[in-house]
Structure formats: structure tokens, C-alpha cells
Amino acid sequence: VTAEEVIDLVHKKGMKKAAQEVDVVTTGTFGPMCSSGAYLNLGHSRPRIKFGGGSVYLNDVPAYAGFAAVDVFIGATALPDNDPRNKIYPGEFNYGGGHVIEELVAGKDIRFVATTYGTDCYPRKRLETLINIKDLNEVVLFNIRNAYQNYNVAVNLSDKTIYTYMGVLKPNLGNANYSTAGQLSPLLNDPYYKTIGIGTKIFLGGGVGYVAWQGTQHNPNVIRGDNGVPRRGAGALAVIGDLKQMKPEWLRGVSFLGYGCNLMVGIGVPIPILSEEILRYTAVKD
């Protein structure tokens, strides 16, 4: 059952009976997760070229090339060199790394440009071509901090509008922005990480992924409620998966006015019901 359905089930049948009947509770979240990106292996051209030490662009968005000859990594928040940023305030940030990843997974051709220095074994100094996900050796989504367990509500106490990664905040408490899947959220349904850990198989971006490690800034030692739910930012997941299996419906490049670009990521995590205690955690409500 889903993390929403289990709430009614527990209410109708009680914790003990529900724990006997339910094998797995499915959880999910879909939101902007800026510590996301993808690494690509393009294979070797003729003559060969070494990207490492040079510069690489995908649809004019810079990627990191400090690996071996033909490995690159593109981050969700990367911006083209010619983007005006906030010189025109608030900046629109119409296209960035998250949009490139969405277009890659959608099967669109991506303009790839690399410039570097030549060597005896890699004599080529420039490569400009179109790449497509179906032709690449590996394309892997690797997100170092996703599915944050809890987070702040953002408000603005000043007398002017401000533009943030939590959206546009109106002056004088004119609005309050937050981002959570509530009772569906994976780490709110397993607040002490009893079933979610390294190697957990998950739904990632419309395909299959895995929990690779704890996410950056993972901090389980926070104040919690009686139900285990943290009262501030706590746990996070680092996740990995084959981008070739994923779908653009679950990986969306987005723009935050006055702030920058991002990638919305869909994540689903199954929680095996091994005990009444674990079921009790999954009955958490909004």
C-alpha cells in the first residue's frame, strides 16, 4: 500500500492487524533537488581527445571535465557563460544543467563542444558534435543530496520582495513557502533509517536507482517529535541510477526567478514492514 493508504488501514484495523496484512509501504517525493547531476562517458573519437584539463560544454552549459579522457559530469545548477545571471534583476535563468539532463533523458540531441590541449596519445584539441543518450557508453544520474528529511519554511520579514531557492518571498510575511511530500515523504516514513540505507533499491527519475550513501549534510542528531519525525533538517540520501532507464516526466529542469536553475527529481522508496514499530512510523500524517 502507499504511505497515504496505510493511514486509513491503521485507523480501520489497528496497528497489529495492519502490520500482519501489509508487506511494503511505498513512499515518494518529487521536488527541486539542486545537489543533483549526471556523469557521462562519451567514448573515444578519432583522432582521440582528452577532455581532462580542458573545457566542456553541453548546449553551452559548462560541465566538469577533471576526470579521465572522455568522462564528464554536469551539475543541475550549471549555467551558460553568457547567462546574464542577476545583472538583469531578478534574473530569469531560463536554461541550465537541469534542463540539459531533462533533454538528454528525453532523447534529444545535445550539442557537445570540448577544447583542450593535445598530447602524444590524445592529439586532438577540439571536438564539436551532437550527442544522444542512446549512443553514449554510460549516462548515470548521481545526486549527492536528495530527499531531505525535513526542511525550513521560508518567510520574508523585510519590506522588499526577495528571490530565493525557496521561491519568491513577498515582504512583511506576505507568503510562506515550503517543500515537502508530507505523509508520502520517504524519510518521514522511516525517521530512524531502519529500512533505508546503502543499497536500497528505489524508483529514481522514472527508472531504477539505488541509495549510494548518506547525502551531504546528513545529520540524524536533531530534535525529534514523539513519532521520530525531526523538527528541522536532518537526514538526506545520495542516490544513483542509469539515466538511460529514466523518463523526462520525473526529471524536470526548472528555473527559479532571481536565483538560478535546478532539477526536479522523482524518488520513490519502498519500506518493508518488518515490525509493528516500522508500520507505526509509516502511519505518520501531514
Regions found by a protein language model. Give the residues of each.
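Anaerobic metallocofactor- and corrinoid-dependent redox/one-carbon enzyme cores
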Residues: 2-286
